[in-house]
Amino acid sequence: MAGLARGDSRGRPPELPGDLSSQEEEEEEGDSDAGASSLGSYSSASSDTDVEPEWLDSVQKNGELFYLELSEDEEESLLPETQTANHVNHVRFSDKEVIIEEDDSRERKKSEPKLRRFTKILKSKSLLPRRHHKKSSSNNGPVSILKHQSSQKTGVTVQQRYKDVTVYINPRKLTAIKAREQVKLLEVLVGIIHQTKRSWKRSAKQADGERLVVHGLLPGGSAMKSGQVLVGDVLVAVNDVDVTSENIERVLSCIPGPMQVKLTFENAYAVKRETAQPQKKKAQSSTQDLVKLLCGSEADAVQHSTLSIPHISMYLTLQLQSEAAREEQEILYHYPVSEASQKLKSVRGIFLTLCDMLESVTGTQVTSSSLHLNGKQIHVAYLKESDKLLLIGLPAEEVPLPQLRNMIEDVAQTLKFMYGSLDSAFCQVENAPRLDHFFSLFFERALRPGKLHLSGSPSAQQYAAASAVLLDNLPGVRWLVLPQELKVELDTALSDLEAADFEELSEDYYDMRRLYTILGSSLFYKGYMVCSHLPKDDVIEIAAYCRQHCLLPLAAKQRIGQLIIWREVFPRHHLQPPSDSDPEAFQEPEGRYFLLVVGLRHYLLCVLLEAGGCASKATGNPGPDCIYVDQVRATLHQLEGVDSRIEEQLATSPGPCLSCADWFLAAPREKADSLTTSPILSRLQGPSKTAASPTCRRTFFSDYSFKARKPSPSRIGGGREPTEGEESAGLSPHATPDAVRKQRESEGSDDNVALLKLARKKSTLPNPFHLGTSKKELSEKELEVYDIMKLTSGPENTLFHYVALETVQGIFITPTHEEVAQLGGSVHSQLIKNFHQCCLSIRAFFQQTLKEEKKKALSDGEHSEPTNSVSSLSPVKEHGVLFECSPENWTDQKKTPPVMSYWVVGRLFLNPKPQELYVCFHDSVSEIAIEMAFKLFFGLTL
């Protein structure tokens, strides 16, 4: 399958145009792809009809590649409205800049329909390079969105270099000319005289062709009639087809009939004037490229507001090399360069003193400190390695201290994965632009987490910002549970890729060692990992790299036309030195490791390759091999029909059902009608007419109001007295589960059975107290399905949110964005924020427990006899916090607003393997974390 898919992406051998209609249909199918399938590929051993891939020019000198091509819709939204109305733009993204290449393809399709037929013929003859958009078809050449503002005249200098001239060409002139040995179509059809240099006639460069310099114009020719072609101009393209002296005759011979043809010329004098400018342009390139892509039109405002916030990252040395005092000699790197960060930079001596003094006094390394700057509290995290110190400072109101400690560990892990060590990253001057780019994205994620979420839904942005406090630094990847048959299909596709025993990847194909060994791969869809064949350590490091470079939120929306990343990496799992204690343990080969990431639409496929060992040894700085890129891209093309089934799993996740916190805040009886007809309940309950009837309405929780109670950590709730006009059948949700069960079972309703079936489809319960009324009427099978969906104990569902971390496999599961968006509600959104911040603090206790357990294990190994050391506190394995909340906008001053209580509980499991569970549920029931964890973790495998 992979071989067939790959064959479609290769260039076709030249053939004479047959049925043009069939060819046009065939080409239109290829052009309808998202931009990635239309790109050709090539290899050194392939035929000369293959075309260079578009990303080849973006490979850096050190072999790295970061190429991003947006989808057509996103390309249009990237430029101002005045330009997007008439242009379709292609974006070429490298490590240092984003370049928009404008193209008048829309107008050309309308005004020049004959050109399409001409283009199809050229494609069928493999004369049309797939990168023909590189030359701008408008008067504006390539424009960098990083170097110009939208209000500036971005094409002033480029207009002097390129110009488009439309001329009329009639191939029928050839029939009027007597047959001669050599007919120069450039002179006969266009009227341009080009004299080939004698040194080119028998030169090896003749195969690549010579630049078509205009040496003269034929009187009466099309070029002279246009009045725009001058002697000295260079013809670079015909209808966006790159031409040289080698292929100009073949390109002109493909013109089917009389038509208008666009000629692109380059002014030779402008080329000479701009030869000295490339180095200056590189120096002016910005490091905010991905931020502009992610934030869109708000990029400038976001970046300006970010720079006004005091934040900094510094890499300092503790040992000065010379006695002579030199200003800032201890600073090896710092970012950003702004007025707000300058104040933090000026007090770096305090950080150095604390790091040195506390370690000498206490014997432990300093991890964090706090200071006040202009009335704002700033947290600073420390990470010391040998005689170097990494510092990251962020405002306390934006980033809590436990999160900052996790963030600096995550940054250090990612930089070591990219460069091998912190010294290699910060002490090499050529890495400075890449580090600026890295920390630019890092601070944007830290200070504006909601801005980088590409969904237009405000609830999704709020959830992304609230959950980033905890989820972004968990030692795991967000996992999406899939059905077994779908999981097998994904596993098969990745296994076929990793086998690498077909076509060019086979050693028998060239009778030589393959270049790389594929160690494994991981597949992401919309930021969720759906399949992985990599060890836990590799998965965590690769996911951290993608997260730090904002690739996961980028793939969450269909913005990727094609993404190709190639770089050498240093995975800790493979490069750690072997232990001397076990000589029979597996020894990793001495090789080099490379990461290949290919993105297409919502997919992101990460492949880890090894050079050395079974494969050939890598020398120098190898760039990406086109064959491997094609095979990975072909694997993604095989999954084109799978994305719809994954979308179904996102919409109806098989995870446990959730309840909305707003449902538990009772409204007055006179407001019950408005609550039961709210968009949230109507969307989840469906078009049930009985939901608004009086007999059914009394079963809604909104008809029952709480009896106001003082804040208390007690989990024993009291009943309430029925208010005037209400039936005494109403229950307080703080009543015991037995009382709820007895009274609910006495109120049966056939309508609730249909509601339960609807809830199974939507994976969220419309109202937690709307389902228990008819449990005795459900069949045994329906009860079993209901119990599987409901994680909490008791007759009703009281689960609000959860996070389950499986540290052995490096994954965690949590409700999807779609599930949280369905619940909505102002109280529930605040609950989500409180949940993640509280879990962050609870996990800090668990991390301390794990450190103590490791120390205990080491001490037990060194001392066979039990030690008499007594710890002041027992290891924390379960921790809970009780919250109470009331409606924000409570207008009835005569009545006390209702109060809802909920618990946030975290549980650490050390045996049989480390696991962490965090749940949020209503105070009306008592939950056992072990039972909930068993339901969540049972059968959870990669």
From Swiss-Prot:
Q: Where in the cell is it found?
A: Cytoplasm; Cell surface; Cytoplasm, Cytoskeleton, Cilium basal body; Cytoplasm, Cytoskeleton, Microtubule organizing center, Centrosome, Centriole
Locate the PDZ domain: which residues? Answer: 185-267
Q: What happens when the gene is disrupted?
A: Embryos die at midgestation. Embryos exhibit multiple defects including neural tube closure defects, abnormal dorsal/ventral patterning of the central nervous system and abnormal anterior-posterior patterning of the limbs resulting in severe polydactyly. Fewer and shorter cilia are present in mutant embryos. In mice lacking both Intu and Fuz, the lack of convergent extension and more severe patterning defects in Intu and Fuz mutants does not result from a functional redundancy between these proteins.
> What tissues contain this protein?
Widely expressed in E8.5 and E9.5 wild type embryos. Present in various adult organs (at protein level).
Any single GO BP term: negative regulation of cell division
Q: What GO terms are given for molecular function?
A: phosphatidylinositol binding
- Does Phosphoprotein count among this protein's keywords? yes
Which intervals carry biased composition (Acidic residues)? 22-32
| Keywords in alphabetical order | Cell projection, Cilium biogenesis/degradation, Cytoplasm, Cytoskeleton, Developmental protein, Phosphoprotein
InterPro entries xrefs? CCZ1/INTU/HSP4_longin_1, CCZ1/INTU/HSP4_longin_3, CCZ1/INTU_longin_2, INTU, PDZ, PDZ_sf
Polar residues composition bias: which ranges? 137-156
The record's family statement is: Belongs to the inturned family.
This molecule's function is given as: Plays a key role in ciliogenesis and embryonic development. Regulator of cilia formation by controlling the organization of the apical actin cytoskeleton and the positioning of the basal bodies at the apical cell surface, which in turn is essential for the normal orientation of elongating ciliary microtubules. Plays a key role in definition of cell polarity via its role in ciliogenesis but not via conversion extension. Has an indirect effect on hedgehog signaling.
Q: How does it assemble?
A: Component of the CPLANE (ciliogenesis and planar polarity effectors) complex, composed of INTU, FUZ and WDPCP. Interacts with CPLANE1. Interacts with NPHP4 and DAAM1; INTU is mediating the interaction between NPHP4 and DAAM1.
Designated name of the protein: Protein inturned
